Structures are given as C-alpha cells and as structure tokens.
C-alpha cells in the first residue's frame, strides 16, 4: 500500500512538473507573441491528427490578444476544420506542411437560402480546412506549405468533407506572404466580402484540382509576385449573391506574377458578376497557358465594370488571349438589369493564341449596354489561323460566358460587336497558318480607330479590316506585314477620319452604398433595393438651408466620352417633408434636389434644381473619372441607386 502511495505521489509530482513546464512554456510563448503548435501537442509525424493542437494554439494566441501560430518543420495532418481568430497569423517554417485528410471530420457545409444564385462551392464556406468569418488582422506566411493532399473535394462535398483550403467571409486585413498552397479541392482560397488584402510571394499549385484564388466582392487588394497554377481558374475576381447582398469591388493591384490555367481562365472577371467593379490594375504578368481566356472580362449578372488596366503582360498558349463580353444571364438576387464594361486599357501586351475559333473578342449588348472606351496600345497578338474563308455574319451566342459561347468568329484577329469608342494604336495581329478570314471585323459600333495597325493578309482574304453598321471609323497608317496598305471594306458604315465623330451613348449606374458613406448618413437594408441596401440619414438630421459639412455618400464613376449628362436617382420620398437631397458633381456647387415625387416604393427620379424651377441637372463632363455626392437635406429620403447618362431622353427602368 505504501509503495503504491509512493508511486502515485511520484506520478503526481511528475504531472505537477509537466504542468508547470507547460505553464511556463505557454506563458513564455504568450509573452513572446509566438505560439508553437508543438507546445500544444502537435506531433508533426504526418499520421496523427494534429487539428486539436493547432486549434489550441490559435485559441491561445487569440486569448492573449493576438499573436503568431508557429508551424515548425514537420508534416501535420489536419483532419478537422481549423477555426481562425482575429489578430492571429500562421507562420509556416521551411520544411513544414499542414496536410488535409480523408474522412468526414471537417465542418459540414452550412445552409444558404441564396444557393440558386451561384454554384454549391461558392455558396458554402464552413466546409474548409481553415475557416473564418468577420475577422480582422489574420494571415499566413511562408515558406511552408498547406496541402490538401488529394483529399479535398473538387465537386460538391458530402457532410464532413472539405472542398477548399482557406475560406474567409467578411474579413478585413488579410496577409498571404510566401506560403504555398497545393491541391486545394474546388478552391485553394475562397474569400468573399473581404477588404485590405495584401499578398507577396504567394504560391498556389492546384493544377490537379480546380481553382486557385477566387477573390469575391473584395476591396483594397494588392497582390505581388504570385505564382498560381490551377486546373480551372487561376486568379479570378467575382461578385456573387452568396452573402445575400450585392457588394462592391475595387481598388485592386496585381503585379509581378505568373498565372497558368490548365483547363480554363488565367486572369478573369466573372462569371459571377452581381456587384460593380472599378479601379483594377494588372502589370508585369506572365501567363503560360489557359484553355479558355488569358485575360477574360465578362459582366453576366448586371455588373458595371470600369477602370480596368492591363500593362506589360505576356501570354502564351492561351486559346483566347483577350475576351470581353456583356451577357444577359442576370443570376443575382437583386433582380438586376444588364451590365456595362467601360474604360479598359491594354498597353504593351504580347499574346499567342491557341485556337483558330476563339479570336480576341469584344462582345457587348445593344442599346445602352455596349462595351465602350477600350484602348489597345502596343498590343501584338499571334493566332493559330488555319481557317478558310467564311461568312462575315454575326456568330451565334449561346448565352454562356466562355469564349466558346460564341460561334467561330468571322475574323481571325479581332472581332468587335456592339462596341463603341475603341482605339488601336501601334498594334498588330498575325497568324501561324494561312487564314482566309479578314484580320478585323467590327459590327454595330461607333467611333472605332485604328492607327499604325499591322495585319497579316491571308492568301484568300478579301480584305483586312471590315466595318459593318459602324458609325464613325478611322483607319490611318495601317499596313500588312509585307508593307502593303491594308485593305478596308465597309457596309452601312461611315468613315470619320478628319471629322468630329458622333457622340456615343454612355450610361453609368452605381449603388448608393458603394460610395464612401459618412455619418450621419448610413447604410440600411431593404430586400426591395437593387443591391439589398440603400443610403439615408439617421432620423432627426435635417439641413434645409445649406449642404451639411458631413453626412453624405461620395460615389465614384467614370464616363467614356465627354458630353452633357443627365442624373437620375432610384429613391423613396415618403412625404413632402422627406423629399430632398443636396447633390453635387465632383467639387462643384451644391444643388438643392427638392420636390422628389413622393411614394413609399422605389422609383426613378430625375435630379433637378429647386432654384431653377426644378429643371433637370445637366452637367458637362469630360471623359474620365468623376464623383457624385449626395448629402442629406431631409431625414426620411432614401437613395438606392444612381444613373448618369448622356442620352438625355433615357428614362431608367428597373
């Protein structure tokens, strides 16, 4: 009995010592701000499930007010979802790998009442190796690896299966530096409604699985020195309805990166395009393969996409080097209309296409939903060629967003349809194999200019540049690769060289809540609003005699052509005492927009000037970037959406 007591006492002493050592280690780690997962029980042997230890380290760092979770060299199997916490960064040391596992230990996909607006993978976020919602100050730094290990699902996962490595929603302040992600299932990274994202030296290799990084509804993003190889889309910018709202996107820069997409798109906008996109800059990028689009930009669900700029980009082995398309899918929960694409520039681009059918294409819709304001400077594209002559009629459109949604283009080089204000300067297109089609065909456009444009002429091509129903085209100093003057053919078109071209129709729309909203103006939810939200002032705030010094929404917008514009707002003015705003364009004088037609439902109203007998406000705008500001005047007035158009007879509709 006494021996057993002594043994028990010895064990108790050892336990006390171990506990004390653990406490000292934990206290030391906390003090240093670094939490080593091995101190919390991780084995790193590649076979034991280290998820619990990793989670303990995360929780300890969070309890300490934030810190770094260190992953030392070793292979750490993680068979359960790790729940991220604010102000916690993972540091993966050289030689460290966190690997996924088979089985059903991951969090099940949550329910989502908005499933019908995007596919399963985009609609669910919990079913991931790492998940977080409404977090701030989180990150992953390398040079270690997170590897799904071939265990993550590329289709729709069953309960307990994961289909992504990193899944984040409604986060702010994400850092991804130097870490490598491999075999990510459907997504290596899925972020939705996150802002202030920075990434340097991120490496993704998910060519055996599906997507690299889906950046959805994001603002203020900087990506440098990324290397992303994917099977589906490599780096893609989207805006869906998975979070139950139409959300803005913008202020994005990607530089010094390499992208590859084995089956699909390398650098892509869409197809999910509910919210508007503005201010994107891509520079010094190499793309080495894309079986769909190299540079793809589509608006399928009502998005207005503007101010997108590509510079110093080299593409090889891409089926469609450049593709812009406006579609009419309208798969978004806010009953969207048809979108716009405007103010897009391509500078110093060299591309080699890999499909004779998917010629570089700009495809807009008729009416006010055309592509506009696109410039190409020093853009040189080589396509496979190899087609014979064919009809020059408009190809079929199956309504999809991919390059193969359109039939074989009647031009081997550029095909433009419903595109206005497009300019090519010092650019060229040629083929690898003789082709009987013209180099360029433009159909139903305005103000198309080709200056210093070089084409290769096929032996059976009837002409080099063709214009069909184009109002205002100009071709100067265009030649073939042999030095001969380029042949131009036109039908139902007018040349505009040396004349002032007719104005193009420009219509820009934007959500009121997409601007910079300052107190006491506030964003409120309403499912009947076009984006699910609107802007109004907090009750009790009125400023009838003059515009307030604060309390407004400042909405940026860009117009592709100079001219006189009319302003519209989608509003609710419940009574005659709640029917006004202060409005100004850029830093101009304030206008008292009063006497808005009263109604308890959303409706469009022209912005008018109360001091000028309620005449419509018609500012003269230069082409380029502007702002429109709405400040409060009477509480109760609500603003959902704005529209700026140079079609002075246009009346917006829902």
PLM regions with names:
Residues 3-11, 17, 23, 28-501:
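Extracellular/periplasmic carbohydrate-active domains that bind, remodel
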Residues 19, 38, 56, 70, ...:
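Surface-exposed charge patches in extracellular/virion surface proteins
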Residues 501-654:
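Extracytoplasmic
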């Amino acid at each position: 009995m006494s021996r057993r007591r002594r043994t028990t006492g010895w064990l108790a002493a050892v336990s006390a010592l171990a506990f004390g050592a653990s406490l000292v280690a934990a206290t030391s780690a906390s003090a240093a701000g670094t939490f080593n997962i091995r101190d919390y029980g991780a084995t790193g042997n590649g076979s034991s499930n280290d998820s619990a230890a990793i989670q303990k380290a995360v929780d300890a760092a969070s309890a300490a007010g934030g810190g770094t979770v260190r992953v030392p060299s070793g292979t750490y199997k993680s068979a359960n979802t790790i729940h991220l916490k604010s102000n916690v960064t993972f540091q993966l040391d050289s030689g460290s790998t966190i690997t996924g596992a088979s089985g059903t230990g991951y969090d099940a996909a949550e329910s989502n009442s908005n499933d019908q607006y995007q596919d399963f993978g985009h609609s669910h976020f919990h079913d991931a190796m790492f998940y977080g919602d409404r977090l701030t100050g989180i990150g992953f730094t390398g040079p270690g690896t997170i590897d799904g290990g071939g265990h993550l699902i590329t289709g729709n996962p069953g309960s307990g299966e994961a289909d992504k490595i990193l899944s984040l929603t409604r986060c702010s302040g994400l850092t991804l530096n130097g870490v490598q992600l491999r075999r990510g299932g459907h997504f290596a990274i899925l972020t939705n409604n996150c802002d202030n994202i920075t990434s340097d030296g991120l490496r993704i290799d998910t060519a055996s699985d599906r997507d690299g990084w889906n950046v959805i509804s994001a603002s203020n993003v900087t990506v440098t020195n990324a290397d992303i190889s994917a099977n589906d889309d490599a780096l893609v910018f989207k805006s869906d309805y998975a979070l139950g709202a139409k959300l803005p996107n913008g202020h994005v820069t990607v530089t010094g990166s390499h992208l590859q997409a084995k089956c699909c798109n390398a650098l892509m906008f869409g197809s999910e395009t509910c919210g508007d996109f503005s201010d994107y800059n891509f520079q010094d990028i190499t793309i080495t393969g894309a079986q769909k689009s190299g540079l793809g930009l589509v608006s399928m669900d009502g998005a207005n996409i503007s101010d997108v700029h590509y510079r110093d980009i080299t593409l090889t082995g891409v089926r469609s080097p450049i593709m812009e398309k406006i579609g009419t899918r309208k798969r978004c929960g806010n009953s969207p209309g048809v979108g716009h694409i405007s103010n897009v520039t391509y500078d110093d681009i060299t591309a080699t296409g890999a499909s004779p059918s998917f010629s570089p294409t700009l495809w807009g819709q008729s009416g006010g939903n055309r592509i506009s304001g696109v410039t190409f400077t020093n853009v040189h594209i080589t396509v496979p060629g190899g087609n014979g002559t064919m009809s020059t009629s408009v190809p079929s459109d199956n309504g999809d967003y991919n390059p193969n949604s359109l039939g074989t283009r009647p031009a081997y080089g550029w095909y433009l349809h419903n595109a206005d204000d497009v300019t090519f300067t010092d650019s060229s297109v040629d083929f690898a194999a003789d082709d009987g089609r013209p180099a360029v065909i433009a159909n139903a456009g305005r103000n198309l200019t080709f200056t210093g444009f070089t084409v290769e002429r096929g032996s059976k091509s009837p002409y080099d540049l063709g214009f069909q129903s184009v109002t205002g085209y100009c071709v100067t100093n265009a030649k073939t690769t042999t030095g001969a003057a380029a042949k131009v053919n036109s039908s139902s078109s007018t040349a505009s060289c040396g004349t002032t071209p007719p104005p193009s129709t420009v219509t820009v729309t934007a959500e009121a809540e997409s601007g910079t909203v300052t107190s006491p103006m506030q964003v409120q939810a309403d499912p009947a609003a076009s984006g699910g939200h609107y802007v109004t002032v907090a009750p009790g705030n009125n400023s009838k005699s003059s515009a307030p010094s604060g309390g407004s929404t400042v909405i940026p917008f860009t117009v592709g052509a100079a001219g006189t514009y009319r302003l519209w707002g989608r509003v609710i003015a419940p009574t005659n005492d709640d029917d006004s705003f202060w409005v100004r364009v850029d830093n101009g004088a304030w206008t008292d927009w009063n006497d808005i037609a009263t109604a308890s439902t959303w409706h469009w109203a022209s912005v008018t000037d109360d001091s000028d007998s309620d005449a419509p406000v018609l500012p003269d705008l230069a082409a380029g970037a502007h702002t429109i500001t709405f400040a409060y005047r009477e509480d109760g007035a609500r603003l959902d959406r704005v529209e700026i158009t140079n079609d002075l007879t246009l009346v917006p509709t829902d």
